[in-house]
Amino acid sequence: MIQGRIMSRPESIENRWDILYRDYPEVYEAFSNTPYHPTVYEQLPGIINLRGRCIADVGAGTGTSSLALAQYARQVIGVEREAAMLRQAREKARGAGSQRVTFLSGDALALPLADDSVDLVTGITLALYPPEQYRNFIREGLRVAKGPVVYLGIPPGWYGGDLYKVIEDVEKVDDKVDHIFIEEFQFSHQDIFSDQEYRTVGHIVSTYGFIFGKKEIEYLKRENKTTIRWKFRVYWRE
């Protein structure tokens, strides 16, 4: 069954994150687990105090962000709407023997949590949502958090990391997102950098290239590129 799906897998899903989350959680897992130096989670505590807090991690995916946050938090509640991703997250938490992390099925637009029920809300690159829905999940984060709400996004001009100039035919929504967070909701923001090391061209093509497009695959192969530099924007409101 798995072998048949791999054999029929397209060369790329061309920026269709909804397809990635629903049908290829194993590719997302390989992509998100490719090492970053320094990691986002190593840099976040320099911006927001995470220690000893109960954190709702919205859009938890396969659990990588939730388990990383558990190094600092008292408890992490990962919220994920895609069933395939949620299964992997729960398996990963069991495999890690983590007692601090639990996962709930739920949507960023209607969190399965009561008002003021957690100390802090995080959302690590909620890429699936169009800009017009950001207002709703920001309001949901503010509703359930007693303290800070922290979202990680991509600043204008950095979609896809340092290959943003290669990526074309993608709706550029970064400016809209920036306006919503900073102008409408008065979030503070700070940019951080991280280098993602894939080590081999084969690995970067089968993960990054599969996600972002055939043109990117051609570029990666031609340039023998194995590292992507990312610029992330941390938005937070206390």
Q: What does each model-found stretch correspond to?
A:
Residues 129-140:
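A short, conserved alpha-helix within the catalytic core of class I
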Residues 2-51, 150-178:
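Conserved class I S-adenosyl-L-methionine
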Residues 125-126:
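Short catalytic micro-motifs in class I SAM-dependent methyltransferases
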Residues 69, 140-141:
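Class I S-adenosylmethionine-dependent transferase superfamily signal
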Residues 183, 189-238:
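Conserved Class I S-adenosyl-L-methionine
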Residues 56, 62-110:
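Class I SAM-dependent methyltransferase SAM/SAH-binding core
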Residues 122:
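A conserved beta-strand element that flanks and buttresses the S-adenosyl-L-methionine
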